[in-house]
Regions:
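Surface-exposed amphipathic alpha-helical tracts and adjacent flexible/coil segments at the periphery
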Residues: 1-174
Length: 174
């Protein structure tokens, strides 16, 4: 789940040329999200893909042997990650995933599954005013989840270190 790269991820030359930041080094400037003008079309975001969302296809992916998933969101808010994880957990449990909250937290006018399903007509999108308003509405509720004190769990740790043998570390919760 998360952002799709118009280029081959990490290989974007546009980021380096326009943004002076190498996507090859994890510093993508997201130049593809900018509006461009070409052939009479002005300020068109022709390279801006919607974020990928395969949550509705989770059971099918599991049947195909997919054992782990990645949420693309290293620069996203904790609320976004929480909404994505919640939707994935719900789908995995056979429940109806809360895609409305996930979409409200952040989307570019919805999501796409076009590369997976082959339905590529609605793959492009940008953040619209409605997307921003939805986020402002849902974020305070989700932020409350992070205002609770972090629970502390007592751990017992055993370390065994002997010359010529691999070190062994064992942790147990109380």
């Amino acid at each position: 789940h998360g952002a799709l790269c118009m280029s081959v991820s990490g290989q974007c030359g546009l980021s380096a040329v326009i943004g002076s930041r190498s996507a090859n080094r994890g510093r993508c400037a997201q130049a593809c999200r900018l509006p461009f003008s070409a052939k009479g079309a002005k300020n068109v975001c022709a390279l801006s893909l919607k974020d990928l969302c395969l949550v509705p296809h989770l059971a099918e992916l599991a049947q195909d042997g997919v054992a782990s998933l990645k949420i693309e969101g290293r620069c996203k808010r904790p609320e976004y990650v929480a909404a994505a994880v919640t939707a994935l957990v719900q789908a995995r449990a056979g429940e109806e995933p809360d895609l409305d909250t996930l979409r409200a937290v952040f989307s570019r006018s919805g999501f796409t599954d076009g590369y997976y399903t082959g339905k590529r007509q609605q793959m492009f999108g940008t953040r619209q005013k409605e997307d921003v308003l939805q986020a402002k509405e849902v974020l305070p509720h989700l932020a409350q989840l992070y205002q609770k004190p972090t629970p502390q769990i007592a751990l017992t740790m055993d370390v065994r270190v002997q010359t010529g043998e691999p070190a062994a570390l064992t942790l147990r919760d109380a």
